[in-house]
Design a protein with these regions (language model features):
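Membrane-water interface at loop-to-transmembrane-helix junctions
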Residues: 121-123, 182-209, 238-259
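Membrane-water interface regions at transmembrane-helix termini and the short interhelical loops
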Residues: 37, 41, 60-81, 94-101, ...
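Select transmembrane alpha-helical segments in multipass membrane proteins
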Residues: 4-18, 53-59, 118-130, 209, ...
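Extracellular/periplasmic helix-exit of transmembrane alpha-helices
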Residues: 173, 177-181, 185-187, 208-237
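Flexible loop linkers connecting adjacent transmembrane helices
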Residues: 1-8, 31-45, 70-75, 224-245
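Hydrophobic transmembrane alpha-helices that form the core helical bundles
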Residues: 7-44, 55-56, 264-265
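Hydrophobic alpha-helical segments and their helix-loop junctions in multi-pass secondary transporters
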Residues: 85-121, 126-145
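Junctions where cytoplasmic loops transition into the N-terminal start of transmembrane alpha-helices
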Residues: 143, 147-148, 153-208
Length: 265
């Protein structure tokens, strides 16, 4: 609808989507985490070739996962539920066992307070924060594909994306479908809105907050205040300090981080 026209915007947003979601940055981070869990240390410059091979294998694994399973959304759903259970079980366990409950209150109130601007200001970090927040535009569009493939609302009328192997042919409409505004359809529409509100408030918002809370609560409790967190090693500080309690936590913590990165990929 906007100039210079649909052909330009199709290419423009496809390029943005590729650099945000298709560029294998998450695969590289997941590979570093997996290698760190295996080697007992975070990979460095001598390990770059190995890390690149592991990252390539992870990208290939994602392609294979999406190639099977009837419809893509069903395979993604199986993996998402499994990974969600693994991540939250680990985070809840270590928080309950090793973080004093008085610290839980401090972390919770910190979500509603502003402690000031750090000095010196790291504008690169602030820019990355702003970019991550803004990236939800295209990212959320990809989530709507799952809603459509699941058949929610009018999604059942426009088809789904079949997997390359094992999926039966499903005709996918290029345009949306609007229901006639009859009294019966409006009743169904209001019912779907209740599902949407429950999903956004209780599933999406609540679990996003819990995920942030548990990670921040653990990090601020076990990592000494003022620790300089830089580079790939920044993701290993929780594993390092938890391993002082029990060496096995090095692997478990990094493997948990790997699940998070791999699921996002």
């Amino acid at each position: 609808r906007l100039k210079p026209g649909p052909k330009f915007w199709a290419v423009f947003y496809s390029a943005l989507g590729f650099f945000q979601l298709g560029w294998p940055a998450l695969a590289g981070s997941a590979a570093a985490t997996l290698l760190g869990a295996y080697m007992g240390r975070m990979p460095g410059a001598p390990d770059q070739a190995t890390q690149a091979w592991v990252a390539s294998a992870l990208v290939l694994a994602v392609v294979l996962i999406l190639s099977f399973g009837g419809t893509i959304e069903r395979m993604l759903e199986y993996f998402a539920w499994t990974m969600l259970a693994v991540v939250f079980l680990f985070l809840v366990t270590v928080n309950v066992l090793f973080v004093p409950f008085s610290h839980w209150a401090t972390t919770f109130t910190g979500f509603f307070q502003f402690s000031g601007i750090p000095h010196p200001i790291d504008w690169g970090l602030i820019g990355a924060l702003a970019a991550t927040a803004g990236s939800g535009g295209i990212g959320n569009l990809t989530v709507t594909n799952w809603v459509r493939d699941k058949g929610f609302g009018m999604g059942s009328k426009v088809g789904a994306i079949p997997s390359a192997v094992g999926g039966h042919r499903i005709q996918l409409s290029r345009v949306g479908t609007v229901f006639p505004a009859t009294p019966e359809n409006l009743v169904r529409w209001r019912e779907w809105l209740r599902y949407v509100h429950a999903d956004q408030v209780w599933v999406w918002a609540l679990f996003c907050f819990l995920g942030m809370f548990l990670n921040v609560n653990l990090a601020t409790a076990i990592v000494p205040h003022g620790t300089d967190l830089q580079g790939l090693a920044a993701g290993a500080y929780q594993a390092q300090y938890l391993s002082l309690i029990w060496p096995g936590f090095w692997f478990l913590t990094l493997f948990n981080g790997f699940w998070i990165l791999f699921k996002t990929q």
